[in-house]
C-alpha cells in the first residue's frame, strides 16, 4: 500500500525509517519542515508533502505519530477534504479513547477508516522495529494494513472496536507508573541499606521481581543519568488521560494519582524532558 506518515518526532522518525527500509514509505509531512528534509536526505526518493491534505490525497495508508489530542484533531481536520474512500489511517499516538471515537466518525463520513493503534516500547522499540501495537477499529482494515505495520511492530493485537486501542494503552501507562514507583522506591531502599546497587539490579533482575524497567533503566538511574526513552512530561500527559477515563468509570487510581503528583514536582523542577526513571530523584536518600 502507498504509505505516508505524519509526525516525525522521537517515535515518528525511526518509524518512518523502518517503513522506508521495508519499501513502503512514499510520502511524509512534519510540522517542522527541516525534520522532514532530514528524513528525505536518508530516504532518497521520498516526497515531502506541503500539507497533511496533500499527503492524504496520494496515500492509501497514513500513519500518524503526534503528541496530543489537539494535534491529532488538527491533522485529521486538515486531511478530511482530500481523503479518498478506502484510505486507512493508523494513529500510533497516545490520546483519549473519546478523541479516537470522534475522529473515527469524522473519517468514516469520508468513506475512509481510522484505527487507533497506540504503541508500547518507547524510543528503543521504535528504533529497533520492536514496538507492540494495540489496535481499535475495524478488524478487516487492520488486516489490510498488517503487512505494512509489521515493518515497525513485532506484535500487533486487535483489541476491539474504535477506542479499544487507546483504552488498552491506558492500561499499559497505568502499569508503567506502578512499575516506576516500585523500582525507584526499592532502589532507594537498597541505597539506604548501603547495598551495592549494581549487584542489587543483577540479582533482582534474575528473580520474580525482575522486569524490563529495572533491566533497562536501573543502571542509568543509579548513576543519576536519565536520558529520555519516555519523557516525564509525556507520561504525565498520558496519566492525566487515564485519570479522566477512570473518573468517568468511578474507579479510583491511587498509584496513578501519586505518580501524577510526583511528575508534576519533577516538571516544576525542570526535569520534564528526562526519562521517567528520573522519579528516582525524588526517592533516593
Segments from the language model and where they lie:
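NAD(P)+-binding Rossmann beta1-loop-alpha1 motif at the extreme N-terminus of oxidoreductases
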Residues: 1-64, 87, 123
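Rossmann-fold dinucleotide-binding core
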Residues: 3, 94-174
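Hydrophobic beta-strand scaffold residues
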Residues: 26, 48, 114-115, 156, ...
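Rossmann-fold NAD(P) dinucleotide-binding segment
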Residues: 52-113
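Active-site-proximal catalytic alpha-helix in oxidoreductases
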Residues: 128-136, 157, 161-193, 204-216, ...
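Interdomain hinge/lid region at the active-site interface
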Residues: 162, 210-275, 285
